[in-house]
Amino acid sequence: MKLIRNIFVALAALLFSASLVNAGEKWDMALAYGAGNFHSANATEFAKNVTDKSGGKLTIVTHPGGSLFKGGEIFRAVRTGQVPIGERFMSALGKEDPLLEVDSQPFLATNYGAAMRLYQASKAEIVKGLDSKGLVFLYAVPWPAQGLYS
């Protein structure tokens, strides 16, 4: 049997500080992964959609590859207002809140359907936990199935 770890939410823990959007505002978005990674591609598409749908009132500029903050620094940087928005692999934030690691437990969700059910069951508490830290959860992206790792 192939060991599969299906991280349903790479959280693209897309987090952002709960600040108000001003007309014509530009936000820099910290991304840990390189521009070619699918999480960075999703974030770039998200940023484009925000710019388009806001009529240019908010422009989000993505900064892939840890060019603004390294992966392990993004959560703190958003919380402290050093950057208004950032994307982070959710289970990497387990020291902040153990619930953020729920999707990385081996064999808990072994396919995308099970991962979606786990996401739906845990989302409300994840959102509440991030809110208590002054962050807003925007979207989640499934992480492709992988084997166990340490």
Where are these regions (language model features)?
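Alpha-to-beta junction loops
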Residues: G55-L58, I74-R88
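Sec/Tat signal peptide C-region and signal peptidase I cleavage site
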Residues: L15-A23
